[in-house]
A protein has these predicted regions:
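Residue-level recognition of the GNAT/N-acetyltransferase active site
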Residues: 25, 77, 108
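Generic alpha-helical secondary structure signal
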Residues: 36, 44-48, 80, 86, ...
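HotDog/MaoC-like acyl-thioester-processing domains
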Residues: 1-18, 80-82, 93-128
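Hot-dog-fold acyl-thioester-processing enzymes
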Residues: 2-71, 127-128
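Hydrophobic beta-strand-centered segment that forms part of the acyl-chain substrate-binding groove
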Residues: 51-100, 114-117, 122
Length: 128
């Protein structure tokens, strides 16, 4: 194993099961003219919550399920800026008895490899 084997690398579309489209907004850009790092996390969170709502796991109008973020990470490989159409790829890498590990990839629309990858661990604290 080399040092390069330990470095994060861009992933292809085949690493993800679901793709959720988004469009960047003018306010997403920072003073350097590219998407601010916090926006990546916002997009990852939005994609996960859309998945949970569509799967009827999360009901924002009165459901009892409550998931908290226990860990998250993001690796950046390519700049993204407004205006861009993007997609967040989502895959579940581990499903435990009270937690879910997600793998996420941010793609500029039409690209075959990720501009960024992320991971997030949700813990179900509601007992449902």
């Amino acid at each position: 194993m080399t040092k390069d084997d330990l470095k994060p690398h861009p992933k292809g579309r085949d690493a993800y099961r679901l793709f959720i489209p988004f469009a960047t907004r003018w306010r997403d850009n920072d003073q350097y003219g590219h998407m601010n790092n916090a926006v990546y996390y916002e997009l990852f969170d939005s994609a996960i919550n859309k998945f949970l709502i569509d799967a009827e796991i999360l009901d924002t109008a009165g459901g009892t399920a409550m998931f908290l973020v226990a860990a998250s990470a993001c690796n950046y490989f390519q700049e993204v800026a407004y205006p861009s159409d993007i997609e967040v790829g989502l895959a579940i890498s581990r499903l435990g008895s009270s937690s879910i590990n997600y793998d996420l990839g941010l793609f500029v629309a039409g690209a075959d490899t990720t501009a960024a990858t992320g991971s997030l661990v949700h813990v179900n604290v509601s007992g449902n």
